[in-house]
Structures are given as structure tokens and as C-alpha cells.
A protein has these predicted regions:
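Extracellular/periplasmic carbohydrate-active domains that bind, remodel
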Residues: 1-278
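Asp-box/WD-like beta-propeller blade repeats and closely related beta-sheet repeat scaffolds
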Residues: 3-15, 22, 385-423
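Aromatic- and glycine-enriched pocket-lining scaffold segments that form the walls
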Residues: 24, 30, 34-52, 405-471, ...
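Loop-centered beta-sheet repeat module
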Residues: 73-77, 81, 90-91, 445-506
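CBM-like carbohydrate-recognition segments
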Residues: 255, 279-281, 285-317, 329-337, ...
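Long, well-ordered core segments of solenoidal/helical folds
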Residues: 285-303, 337-355, 386-405, 445-471, ...
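Inter-helical turn/loop segments and adjacent helix faces that build the functional surface
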Residues: 330, 431-443, 505-517, 569-577
Length: 667
């Protein structure tokens, strides 16, 4: 307050009992000042404080000061400063560069400048190298290099803190070749709103520009880069990070609020992901970015999903449908040609499908037919029409439970899986609406609705409010509860298949179809439960929904499915607007937790469960010796299945969720 009121320094009297603490070493207006080869302990306040000095050297000093406000070395309004070979263990900032607080700094008008910091070790403290907050006179030309920092109590590595009480320009700040074990908050933090409740005269907007951080590594932190700019002025600019690797980031790689300009990342990896400023991304659309990433990773569409040879596969069909929807929104014939390649490779002019076995009565094999059905609008082929009829014939002859629900496969006799509802019913409904008479289409839609409702009745678990992965009509499968026939747990992706099946069937049901409301009501029931199991911290979902265990993990494919259904369902009016907020939270969680930017500027979807299933156990169509008792539906079984990147079963739903977010953001 004395400074704000322009009280001369020699008239500033604080009086008895104010508890003012002196610095241990305080040089004022000195020249050629040197502190070297000493150990400094337990200062009441800052340890070394050169004020308005020139040509200062601190060399080979050991500082141990754990008290409050126990800064190690604070050059204030100084020029030509060298701090090297010094070990800091402090209760506050290790090095804090200053240039006067508020009006004092503005009256002095002496920026701290030409400061070199090298070969130092920083432990504990609020910051390793800090500029501010008493920085009203400005600061420029700081070079920090070849330092090491490592402590769970060290809050930040490079910190710039100021506010509009201080003002001042901070520029040309450089850090390189710094190795950090861990820090508590952020590797780099720039804060122009430090202590926003401080009583002072305001209106002195600070400016931070030309900050360069190169070859800095950190193994653990909460944030990589944390920038708090001003909302009223664009006073943070030209911030560049190059060749840095920050791992073990617990909260967010980069968080920027307020107005900034030209924040750049050049070969910066955080948590294994290449960091790009928004303007440097190759595509603004995440759907396009993922589509082109997959096309680059797998130039031949019939080898998607890690195939070594062409295969008729439900996961590939789902991904190709996602790519098709990217094409429908954004265009580009290269995508369309990529899609054509699959259909041309897999179905010949006679209607023969590579690898398809009608007699397996495998619902998974029906799913890619929906992609082929949708592609008819981009050129129909005779062989495809024949093949589509064969797939419809399979469904019409598919073995069923006594209640009329499709068996999942012949080898899974008498079993209803949530997965199978998605594999069979959307094509069943779509083909009927497009190719059958209205009366026959109505019968097929009724059949599909009945199957969804029976599946709900047989797999729903009142105890958890969730749906089990599968149900065995005989109650005799080794994985089935002998009383209910249900499997043990709710596998998130299985429930994702179930709700996506409802969504896709609703898409093709005519508005005047009287049982459409039943499907909407079921979708609402399931998604209400899904949202209750959404992880509050991350916004995404665990692989097994009904188990709380450290072994459980947040899983991406199911999270993409749920995000997509929440966003689309609310847009279509099938779900209330509250579900839209849950969908946005889920999508943001997916981007933060599961999307990795690779060095080649492609993106990947991480933490995908490769596969999970049940059995088969003994059955009428299971060859002897082909039983799989490992797949017993236990939690440990689900946790034993491999986790991988870029599983097609997640890529398609991620693209769909991304396109829904684009629609939402365009409103």
C-alpha cells in the first residue's frame, strides 16, 4: 500500500508487532557482486536477494530453506546475472526473478534482464524457475539450461506469474536441456491472473511473449502446459515448445484459458501423444482426421483391423460405415474409392462372399452386409444384390430361442448375446424397409422389436440395473447362472452394441410405425442406466460396468458407442436434453483420455478391448475339442483379454460420435 500511495521508502514505517522478516543476504545497487562456495541455511525470508544490482554471480552455493516464503535466489531489477552450479531446497520458489511490485516497479522502470541459469539442481518449492509475481518493471533475456529438478513437492518447473496490478512486459524467456523427474502441478505455467482478489490499483495489463522451451523432459506432473491468459486482452503470445517429452501427466496435457496468440508445439510428446496447436492440426474435423489416419495406416481397406488377408468381418464393416458417413458429410472421392475397394474384393459377380459360411448361422457375418446395403446408392452391382438376398435368407432361417430371438451363432446354440442384436437386427430392418412389401416389412419390424424386448427381459439384472452380456436358454452353459441363465457381468461393449442396435433400427423405422415408441422407451431405460455408471472424473466408462476393482480399466470402444448414442439420441429427440450433456462430457473424455496424436500426425484410438466373449462350451454344433472354457464370463476373464490401439470396433463409433459433435457445434 505504501508503494501504491507513493510513500518514499525511507518513510515506510510498519511499527512494532508487524512480524517483518529480513532476507539472509540482501545486496542493494551493487556491482560485480559474487556469492560462491557457501551453504546457506534457514533464512527468515528470501535467502539471496540482489536488488537493483549489476553483474551478479551466484556459483556453487547450497541453499536449504524450508520456511514459508523461503525463496532461494531472487534477483530483482538486476541485469547481467549468472546463477550456476547451485543446489536449491526451498519452501517457496527456488529462483524467482523480480523487478518491483506494482508502483515501485513502475517508478524504478528497471527490468530484470540478461540472466543465465545453468547446471543447477532444484528440489521442492513452488517453482523451479519463476518470473514474478513482483515483476512490474518487466523482465527480458532469461536463459536457463542444463538443470535438473525432481520432487513431488516442486509445484512447477517454469512459472510466470503476474496480474493487472503488476503490469510489465516479460519477453525472451528461454529454457532448454532441463530434466525433471516429477513436479506437482505443471511443467510450464503462465498465469496472468495470479491472486485475482489482491487489493490494489488495477488496469496495468501485463504482457508475456516470446517464451521458448526446448528439450525439456518430465516423468510426472498434473499438467504439461497450463496457461491462464486474460479474457479482455490478448497478452500471451509466441509461446513455443520444441523437442520436449512430458509423460505421466495425470490431468490434462495442455490447458489454455483466456486469449492467447501463436502457442506452438514442435515435436512435443505428452503422454505418448504428439501435441499440436489447433491451427496446426491437419484436419479440423476429428472424423476426417481419424478417417484419413486409418487410410494411411491401412492403404487396402480389406486389410483393416489387423488382417493379414482379406476377410469378411463385422468389425471392418462397422469401421467402413463410419468412413462412409465421413464421406457423406465432407466428401472426397479418395474415401469413396477406398470403400469401393472392399466391396470389389469381397463379393464377386456371382454373389460369392470371401470367407462367408451360410451354415455357420453366425450373426457377426451379417453385419458387413449393412455396409454393402448402404453402398448401393453409390453404384449397385449384380453380385452384391445376390449376396444381400443370401444374408437376408440367413436371418429368415436363423435358429431362434423358443421366445423367437436369434441364436448368436450355431456354435452358441440357444444363446442370446447383446452383441448379436446389433449384428443382425439393423440389417434385418433396413433391408426389409428398402426391399420388401410394406406388409412384410411391418412383420419384420415387429419381429425385430419383439427380439429387442425379449432380450431386455432375459438379460436385465434388477440388482445392478444393468444388462448382462448374454443369456442361455438352457441354463446349462458353464458360464450361465443355473437359476437365471444369465452370464455373470455387464461387459460395456456388449451394452454398447445393444443401444446402437436400437438407434440404427429407429433410423429406418417409418415415423408412423406404431411400435417405434417401444424402442424409444427401451433406449431411454438403458441409457439412463448407462449414464449412472459413467465415470464422474473422466466422463467415460469402465470395461466391466458392474465391478469396482483396481484391475478394471477405462475402455474406449464402449465409451465411443455410448457417447454416440447419447449425442444422436438427444438430437433425434429419442433422449432428453440431459443426455446430450452426458454425451458431450463423454466425448471430451474420449479426446482427453483415448486419442493420441502420433509423430506422423495421424491419430489413434487407444485402450481398446480387443475381444471378449463366452465359451463355447459343449453344444450340438461345437466340434469336439473346440470348447473354450477360459471364456467363462468372470471378471478375471474380461481383464485377461488384450488391449490394443485402433480396434475397428471403436473406430467406427468414434467417427459417428465425432460427426454428432460437429452437428452440435455447427448449431
Amino acid at each position: 500500500q505504501f508503494a501504491e500511495d507513493v510513500v518514499p521508502w525511507d518513510e515506510r514505517r510498519f511499527g512494532l508487532g508487524q512480524g517483518l522478516r529480513p532476507q539472509l543476504i540482501n545486496f542493494v545497487k551493487g556491482n560485480r557482486v559474487r556469492v560462491s562456495g557457501v551453504t546457506l541455511l534457514h533464512s527468515p525470508f528470501w535467502v539471496i536477494h540482489p536488488l537493483l544490482c549489476k553483474n551478479v554471480t551466484v556459483d556453487g552455493v547450497k541453499i536449504w530453506n524450508e520456511g514459508p516464503n523461503g525463496d532461494g535466489c531472487d534477483p530483482e531489477a538486476c541485469e547481467n546475472v549468472l546463477i550456476q552450479n547451485t543446489h536449491f531446497h526451498t519452501g517457496d520458489d527456488c529462483i524467482a526473478i523480480k523487478s518491483g511490485r506494482n508502483n515501485d516497479g513502475r517508478m524504478w522502470n528497471k527490468p530484470s534482464r540478461n540472466i543465465i541459469i545453468r547446471n543447477c539442481v532444484m528440489e521442492d518449492g513452488h517453482g523451479g524457475i519463476v518470473i514474478g509475481s513482483e515483476i512490474s518493471g518487466g523482465c527480458k533475456n532469461v536463459y536457463a539450461e542444463d538443470c535438473t529438478m525432481d520432487s513431488p513437492h516442486l509445484d512447477r518447473v517454469l512459472r510466470i506469474k503476474t496480474n493487472n496490478c503488476r503490469g510489465g512486459r516479460i519477453e525472451n524467456i528461454n529454457m532448454r536441456r532441463v530434466k525433471v523427474g516429477q513436479c506437482k502441478e505443471a511443467v510450464v505455467k503462465i498465469n496472468l491472473d495470479y491472486e485475482p482478489e489482491e487489493p490494489c490499483y488495477r488496469g496495468f495489463e501485463p504482457e508475456v511473449r516470446d517464451v521458448n522451451v526446448e528439450d525439456v523432459t518430465c516423468r510426472k506432473s498434473a499438467y504439461g502446459v497450463l496457461i491462464v491468459g486474460r479474457d479482455s486482452v490478448e497478452n500471451v503470445s509466441d509461446i513455443r515448445l520444441k523437442d520436449c517429452v512430458f509423460n505421466g501427466i495425470g490431468r490434462e496435457n495442455v490447458r489454455i484459458t483466456g486469449k492467447t496468440r501463436n502457442v506452438k508445439f514442435d515435436n512435443v510428446m505428452m503422454n505418448g501423444s504428439l501435441v499440436l496447436a489447433s491451427e496446426d492440426r491437419p484436419y479440423k474435423s476429428m472424423a476426417q482426421w481419424m478417417t484419413y489416419s486409418e487410410m494411411k495406416r491401412t492403404p487396402k481397406s480389406y486389410l483393416l483391423d489387423f488382417a493379414s488377408k482379406p476377410r469378411w468381418n463385422y468389425a471392418v464393416g462397422i469401421e467402413l460405415e463410419g468412413l462412409l458417413d465421413t464421406y457423406r458429410v465432407h466428401g472426397d472421392d479418395s474415401i469413396l474409392n477406398y470403400l469401393h475397394t472392399y466391396r470389389q474384393k469381397m463379393i464377386d459377380e456371382r454373389g460369392d462372399v470371401v470367407g462367408y459360411d451360410y451354415n455357420a448361422f453366425n450373426l457377426d457375418n451379417v453385419r458387413p452386409a449393412k455396409f454393402i446395403l448402404r453402398m448401393q446408392q453409390y453404384g449397385a452391382r449384380k453380385g452384391e444384390k445376390i449376396a444381400l438376398k443370401i444374408f437376408m435368407k440367413q436371418l429368415l432361417n436363423q435358429p431362434r430361442t423358443r421366445e423367437g430371438v436369434f441364436w448368436h451363432k450355431a456354435i452358441y446354440a440357444n444363446q442370446v448375446w447383446l452383441d448379436g442384436i446389433f449384428m443382425g437386427l439393423p440389417f434385418y430392418c433396413d433391408y426389409a424397409v428398402k426391399n420388401c412389401s410394406p406388409r412384410k416389412a411391418r412383420r419384420i419390424l415387429d419381429d425385430a422389436v419383439n427380439q429387442m424386448m425379449q432380450t431386455d427381459r432375459r438379460t436385465y439384472d434388477e440388482k445392478t440395473g444393468l444388462w448382462k452380456h448374454a443369456w442361455d436358454e438352457t441354463h446349462r452353459q458353464f458360464w450361465a447362472n443355473p437359476l437365471t441363465g444369465q452370464s455373470r457381468h455387464t461387459w460395456a461393449r456388449a451394452l454398447g452394441w445393444y443401444v446402437m442396435a436400437m438407434t440404427e433400427c429407429l433410423d429406418v423405422m417409418p415415423d408412423d410405425y406404431p411400435r417405434k415408441a417401444e424402442v424409444v422407451a427401451l433406449l431411454q431405460k438403458v441409457m439412463k442406466a448407462v449414464v449412472q455408471y459413467q465415470d464422474k472424473k473422466s466422463g467415460v466408462w469402465y470395461d466391466v460396468l458392474d465391478v469396482e476393482s483396481p484391475k478394471n480399466y477405462l475402455e474406449s470402444t464402449a465409451s465411443c458407442m455410448f457417447a454416440y448414442v447419447l449425442l444422436k439420441g438427444s438430437r433425434m429427440g429419442w433422449l432428453d436434453t440431459d443426455f446430450n450433456e452426458a454425451g458431450k462430457r463423454a466425448y471430451e473424455g474420449i479426446l482427453k483420455r483415448f486419442i493420441r496424436v502420433n509423430k506422423d500426425r495421424t491419430i489413434s484410438l487407444t485402450d481398446c478391448c480387443s475381444v471378449s466373449g463366452l465359451g463355447p462350451g459343449k453344444g450340438p454344433f461345437v466340434p469336439a475339442g473346440k470348447e473354450n472354457y477360459k471364456r467363462d464370463g468372470s471378471f478375471d476373464y474380461y481383464m485377461s483379454e488384450p488391449i490394443r490401439d485402433n480396434d475397428a470396433k471403436g473406430i467406427g463409433p468414434f467417427i459417428w460420435a465425432s460427426l454428432e459433435m460437429e452437428r452440435l457445434n455447427a448449431q
